[in-house]
Amino acid sequence: MAVAKADILDAIAGMTVLELSELIKEMEDKFGVSAAAAAVAVAAPAAGAGAAAAAEEQTEFTVMLNSAGEKKVEVIKVVRAATGLGLKEAKDLVDGAPKAVKEGVSKADADALKKQLEEAGASVEVK
């Protein structure tokens, strides 16, 4: 009796997380494999290729505040608006420069924030 792949997928879809965990453990025991080792072995070559691709096209950027310049109050206002920080936290961030203002933002957002901070008198860098 052959079991269709769709039937297997439907049965798995109806399982709880605990049942899935037990199923994986039983499959590892029956076939003498480890699901974690397979994931690491597959991910390792991709990481090497991904590093080269990441160097070519970076998608997440960090806006670094190098110095507040002469208009520190204006820079604090921009930092507060961009990050949602409170006055004290924004002031501490500006006083502690060089520091990251925002991390993991798109190129457009990073450039817009850099422009706002520079207009306020800050020295800014996008990494």
From Swiss-Prot:
Biological process per Gene Ontology, one example term: translation
GO cellular component entries: cytosolic large ribosomal subunit
Coiled-coil portions: none
InterPro entries found in the cross-reference section: Ribosomal_bL12, Ribosomal_bL12_C, Ribosomal_bL12_C/ClpS-like, Ribosomal_bL12_oligo, Ribosomal_bL12_oligo_N_sf
SUPFAM superfamilies: ClpS-like, Ribosomal protein L7/12, oligomerisation (N-terminal) domain
Any Pfam family the entry gives: Ribosomal_L12
Keywords associated with the record: Ribonucleoprotein, Ribosomal protein
GO MF terms, alphabetically ordered: mRNA binding; structural constituent of ribosome
Entry superkingdom: Bacteria
Assembly mode: Homodimer. Part of the ribosomal stalk of the 50S ribosomal subunit. Forms a multimeric L10(L12)X complex, where L10 forms an elongated spine to which 2 to 4 L12 dimers bind in a sequential fashion. Binds GTP-bound translation factors.
Primary role: Forms part of the ribosomal stalk which helps the ribosome interact with GTP-bound translation factors. Is thus essential for accurate translation.
Family listed: Belongs to the bacterial ribosomal protein bL12 family.
Protein's name according to its UniProt entry: Large ribosomal subunit protein bL12
Species name: Thiobacillus denitrificans (strain ATCC 25259 / T1)
